[in-house]
Design a protein with these regions (language model features):
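An exposed, glycine/acidic-rich loop-and-rim segment of catalytic or binding clefts
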Residues: 1-348
Length: 348
């Protein structure tokens, strides 16, 4: 594993970059936000990112970062154990709490240490973080471990956590994927999900289980993203594209992964290239970078732009789930979830 300095934050924190390698694949992670900065498959970088820590700080797109304590949105706050916990409305466009707050996990410096597979096939890194009681308004002292492991097939992310009080927990990684270096209008998508969560103008869930049938969100068979995004449909009224939480079917054959079974969630294709998402998370927020913009150029020299990439945010539930009594980690209970991103066709 190669370790290099990446920069210094405006608060004076030193940020480092760790690069994992396995054959023709490499992954570069930043300790700020446990961020997936680059993922090169046979020489092709398939995730968006910036070249400087200043650019990451200036932009609020959460590129490649681990999100917590609560990925997605919460309307105002939540009640837990008879106590109401107000949360800051850091998404000012929609007036809601977004992705864990003003200083979510994406803006924190994690501790990093390498780890290796028992068979030696690949390289890994483990990021740990302590989130104190009251951090961004959430109850309980939370210990978090996020592990990345790179092998010849792709990248695995494992999330483990424990808290001394009941607390909402909805962890994810917010990487933006593009398989051909262009934009996602050249891609097709298949989702293993027959229902999604309907939202209001604030992107807060109003119905957590609506059929995708007859809507542009029906990706149960391989579908052109360009055609889906061009559809004139009420489902795109508030988000300007796909920014919806899908309930994963888990009906296709699963893949053993340690003590867990991972099920297909998505297949993204661009020509001969493909990425398959496997997970044991029950839900996944799919986001087509509808609000992506900015003046800082990305690694490839282009400016952040709408539909430049797509996010597969595997998670526990959709927006405002704590208000429905969902996505709650009970005190002294071990939380463990995994997501895998497998690649094919990059040598063709």
């Amino acid at each position: 594993m190669q370790i290099t300095p990446f920069g210094i934050t405006k608060n004076g924190e030193t940020v480092r970059a760790d690069t994992l390698r396995c054959g023709k694949n490499s992954a570069t992670l930043l300790d700020r936000g446990a961020t997936l900065h680059a993922l090169c498959i046979a020489g092709t970088d398939v995730v968006l990112g910036f070249d400087s820590i200043g650019a990451y700080e200036r932009n609020d797109a959460y590129l490649g970062a681990v999100i917590g304590r609560y990925a997605n949105r919460i309307a105002g706050g939540f009640t837990l154990g008879g106590i109401y916990y107000p949360l800051a409305a850091n998404d000012t466009d929609h007036g809601v709490h977004l992705h864990g707050g003003v200083v979510g996990f994406d803006r924190k410096i994690f501790c990093a240490e390498p780890y290796a597979a028992l068979d030696g096939a690949g390289e890994g890194i483990r990021f740990t973080l302590f989130s104190e009681d009251g951090d961004q308004g959430y109850p309980g002292n939370l210990s978090l471990c996020v592990s990345y492991f790179l092998d010849a097939q792709g990248l695995m992310i494992r999330y483990e956590a424990r808290c001394d009080k009941d607390t909402p927990l909805n962890l994810t990684n917010h990487s933006y994927f593009c398989l051909d270096g262009k934009n996602i209008t050249t891609h097709t998508l298949q989702l293993f999900a027959g229902t999604y969560a309907k939202t209001d103008a604030r992107l807060i869930v109003t119905d957590p289980c609506v059929s995708v049938a007859g809507t542009p969100l029906d990706f149960r068979s391989e579908t052109s993203l360009a055609e889906a995004l061009a559809a004139q449909s009420p489902v795109f009224e508030f988000a300007g594209g796909i920014d919806h939480n899908f309930n994963l079917d888990k009906t296709a054959p699963g893949q053993p992964c340690g003590n867990a079974t991972l099920f297909p969630a998505a297949v993204l294709r661009a020509g001969q290239r493909s990425m398959t998402v496997l997970t044991n998370f029950p839900c996944m927020q799919v986001y087509t970078a509808n609000f992506l913009h900015g003046k800082d150029p990305m690694k490839n020299g282009s400016l952040p732009s709408r539909h430049a990439a797509i996010c597969f945010e595997t998670q526990e539930a959709g927006a405002d789930a704590p208000s429905r009594g969902e996505a709650i980690l009970r005190a002294d209970t071990l939380y463990c979830r995994t997501a895998k991103f497998l690649f094919a066709g990059f040598d063709a």
